[in-house]
């Protein structure tokens, strides 16, 4: 009888212990969430997510800075053209989830992510679909200015539980920004960023990420938003169409030409616009203040690392701006 009682007591204790353990586990599961406020609301993100999918290129750098390699990236199926080669090496092995404008829900779901980072402008209409797959935060990158990018970096850091690491990164960035401002003498010179020039001149407006960065180091941006922004490509309102006559009227002190594989080039490697009589009348052309830069860095890499890369180029590649 005693033996039976002992056995029953042991079994009862085992059941109670298991029940307590299960209850504790469920409680911990609920507790181990981080409430993240973003552009489309508030999302509870699992603490320290490891399987992260990004739907805009600028978010890649931020994750890498925080020690996380994304498992999925919306790369428009042309990663070599759009992603910096050094960054591409670091994320080797990721899965493409299609285009940034129309990411594949099936591919995203197949990766079983525990966090999706979407772009506010591009993915607002599919946000409800995304959050059914995994916790999703939406941040501004496509139309982000400089401060938007800093804010998004801090939000991502909170979502993955690495705020201290990002604060350290931003402190170093601020030091580089100050150093660049001291090394170059912009003296409020007007500057203009130009992308494609095949059919019409596509300039970035004052609200663009790189435009705002340039004003941080002392330049004055040559144009302001005037209602003629291009809203194609998922709401890309930071683009402004200009004619050569309008450009000549603006006549910036410095022109930065962002190059890429979509640009029409002559046999000698020049854009047809560079041989136009009106182009040659521009102040920046006459004074040798036209600079050719990589579009993947100056336009697509909207991140703290992207900003640092631009600051490095400003210090090294623009001698006319040096003291």
From Swiss-Prot:
Biological process terms in GO annotation: iron coordination entity transport
Q: What induces it?
A: Transcriptionally regulated by fur; repressed by iron.
Q: How does it sit in the membrane?
A: Lipid-anchor
Q: Tell me which residues make up the Fe/B12 periplasmic-binding domain.
A: 51-322
PROSITE patterns, alphabetically? FE_B12_PBP (PS50983), PROKAR_LIPOPROTEIN (PS51257)
Quote the CDD domains the UniProt record gives. Answer: FhuD
Give the keywords, sorted: Cell membrane, Lipoprotein, Membrane, Palmitate, Signal, Transport
Q: Where is the signal peptide?
A: 1-19
**Covalently attached lipid (S-diacylglycerol cysteine), positions:** 20
Q: Which family does it belong to?
A: Belongs to the bacterial solute-binding protein 8 family.
Its name, as the record gives it, is Putative ABC transporter substrate-binding lipoprotein YhfQ
Source organism per entry reads Bacillus subtilis (strain 168)
């Amino acid at each position: 009888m005693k033996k039976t009682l002992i056995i029953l007591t042991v079994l009862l204790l085992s059941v109670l212990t298991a029940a307590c353990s299960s209850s504790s586990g469920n409680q911990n599961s609920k507790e181990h969430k981080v409430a993240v406020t973003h552009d489309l609301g508030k999302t509870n993100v699992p603490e320290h997510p490891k399987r992260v999918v990004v739907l805009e290129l600028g978010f890649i750098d931020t994750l890498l800075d925080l020690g996380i390699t994304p498992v999925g990236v919306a790369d428009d199926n042309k990663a070599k053209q759009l992603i910096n080669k050094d960054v591409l090496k670091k994320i080797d092995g990721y899965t493409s989830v299609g285009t940034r404008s129309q990411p594949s829900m099936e591919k995203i779901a197949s990766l079983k992510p525990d966090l999706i980072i979407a772009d506010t402008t591009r993915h607002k209409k599919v946000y409800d679909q995304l959050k059914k797959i995994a916790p999703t935060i939406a941040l501004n990158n496509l139309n982000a200015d400089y401060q938007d990018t800093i804010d998004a970096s801090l939000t991502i850091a909170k979502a993955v539980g690495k705020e201290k690491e990002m604060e350290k990164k931003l402190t170093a960035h601020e030091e580089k920004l100050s150093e660049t401002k001291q090394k170059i003498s912009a003296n409020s010179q007007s500057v203009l960023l130009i992308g494609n020039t095949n059919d019409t001149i596509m300039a970035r407006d004052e609200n663009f990420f790189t435009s705002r960065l340039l004003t941080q180091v002392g330049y004055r941006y040559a144009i302001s938003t005037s209602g003629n922004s291009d809203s194609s490509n998922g709401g890309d309102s930071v683009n402004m169409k200009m004619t050569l006559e309008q450009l000549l009227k603006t006549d910036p002190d410095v022109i930065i030409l962002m190059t890429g594989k979509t640009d029409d080039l002559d046999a000698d490697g020049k854009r047809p616009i560079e041989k136009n009589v009106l182009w040659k009348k521009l102040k920046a052309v006459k004074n040798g203040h036209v600079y050719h830069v990589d579009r993947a860095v100056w336009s697509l890499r909207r991140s703290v690392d992207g900003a640092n890369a631009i600051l490095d180029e400003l210090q090294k590649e623009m001698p006319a701006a040096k003291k």
